[in-house]
From Swiss-Prot:
GO molecular function, one term: heat shock protein binding
InterPro entries associated with the record: DnaJ, DnaJ_C, DnaJ_domain, DnaJ_domain_CS, HSP40/DnaJ_pept-bd, HSP_DnaJ_Cys-rich_dom, HSP_DnaJ_Cys-rich_dom_sf, J_dom_sf
Start-end of CR-type zinc fingers: 134-212
Organism: Pseudomonas entomophila (strain L48)
Residues engaged in binding Zn(2+) 1: C147, C150, C200, C203
Residues where Zn(2+) 2 binds: C164, C167, C186, C189
CDD domains: DnaJ (cd06257), DnaJ_C (cd10747), DnaJ_zf (cd10719)
Alphabetized HAMAP family for the sequence: DnaJ
Co-factor requirement: Zn(2+)
Listed name of the protein: Chaperone protein DnaJ
Keyword Zinc: yes
Domain (J): residue spans on this chain: 5-70
Length: 375
């Protein structure tokens, strides 16, 4: 099959600049790279074709020979004096291509050996009192710890791991992708460079075993839902001598029967009787420090809010404590006796027609009258 024109392959004009060539090649390399099209023979062929075209056109002397003689000027098999593909340097192109494939620039090769253990997360349920005052709790956490019989090596006591025959102890293997070679983690030793021929009976060569660890956690006063306590070195054990991960204890404060919390402030609803609301009085309300007396002025309405300063929560990072805000809810009397009913009827009759006793209701009814009068 006759070769396509190299300019046509890259989709550029014959006078294209070096920058245009690079841009066109990079687009095709990204589109047809074998890593993005595994098992696709057509994409692999187009990838090779783009490689060949860019290798020639990006080289000044080869491009001149190609422009004058066509494929014969760069392909020895066609009688020209081309130099094959050994001299091409695509590192500047693939620095960008690999960055797009793997989400970053070309860093150092992944080496085998010690690896840090994973961090763990534990959700700790607390009641409001524990969260506000602080506490110390014991928790039991499932984790991975170093195997004691083999000291975390994975090999049976007295034996030693052998060098991986696949990668020769490097931990990586060289994979050919068309005209290019890339380094990949060795599939046999998983980047460790060594394999265990006589595994430990306790951990079966893993070097770590599952275990429940009991820990004491000191919870500072003032924590709230979502706060985290870090226990350094209490996560999963690392592999092959790597450092241990951390344990993050995440706080979740359960709902309280009386109080609702918003940051450093507490809120509660206080039911009061119809008579206390009308005549005024004094009642006891709960706080986290005990009961306090709250004075209710006469004529108190539902929704009235009273602030008890400093009766909220002291922030975990320091500062003044918040407040307790008590919202009054006036209860309508129920299950009335005959005498109680008579008294309320007498009260209603005595209040009827006097708007000074119910200014809000009077104003509302006046507004309703005006509304219907305007219709």
């Amino acid at each position: 099959m006759a070769k396509r024109d190299f300019y046509e392959v890259l989709g550029v004009e014959r006078g294209a600049s070096e920058g245009d060539l690079k841009k066109a090649y990079r687009r095709l390399a990204m589109k047809y790279h074998p890593d993005r099209n595994p098992g696709d023979k057509e994409s692999e062929d187009k990838f090779k074709e783009a490689n060949e075209a860019y290798e020639v056109l990006s080289d000044t002397s080869k491009r001149a020979a190609y422009d004058q003689y066509g494929h014969a000027g760069v392909d020895p098999s066609m009688g020209g004096g081309g130099a094959g593909f050994g001299g091409a340097n695509f590192s500047d192109i693939f620095g960008d291509v690999f960055s797009d494939f793997f989400g970053g620039g070309r860093g150092g090769s992944r080496s085998g050996g010690a690896q840090r253990g994973s961090d763990l997360r534990y959700t700790l349920e607390l009641n409001l009192e524990e969260a506000v005052r602080g506490t110390t709790v014991s928790i039991r956490v499932p984790t991975l710890v170093n195997c004691k019989p083999c000291d975390g090596s994975g090999a049976k006591k007295g034996s030693t791991p052998s060098t991986c025959p696949t990668c020769g102890g490097i931990g990586q293997v060289r994979m050919q992708q068309g005209f290019f070679a890339v380094q990949q983690t060795c599939p046999r030793c998983h980047g460790q460079g060594k394999i265990i021929t006589d595994p430990c009976n306790s951990c079966h060569g893993e070097g770590r075993v599952e275990e429940y660890k009991t820990l004491s956690v000191k919870v500072p006063a003032g924590v709230d839902t979502g706060d985290r306590i870090r226990l350094s070195g209490e996560g999963e054990a690392g592999t092959h001598g790597g450092p241990t991960g951390d344990l993050y204890v995440v706080i979740n404060v359960r709902e309280h029967d009386i109080f609702q919390r918003d940051g450093k402030h507490l809120y509660c609803e206080v039911p009061i009787s119809y008579t206390d609301a009308a005549l005024g009085g004094e009642l006891e309300v709960p706080t986290l420090d005990g009961r306090v007396k709250l004075k209710i002025p006469e004529g108190t309405q539902t929704g009235k809010q009273f602030r008890l300063r400093g009766k909220g929560v002291a922030p975990v990072r320091g500062g003044a404590a918040g407040d307790l805000l008590c919202r009054v809810a006036v209860e309508t009397p129920v299950n009335l006796s005959r005498r109680q009913r008579e008294l309320l009827e007498e009260l209603r009759d005595s209040l009827e027609g006097d708007s000074s006793h119910s200014p809000k209701a009077s104003g509302w009814f006046e507004g309703v009258k005006r509304f219907f009068g305007d219709l």
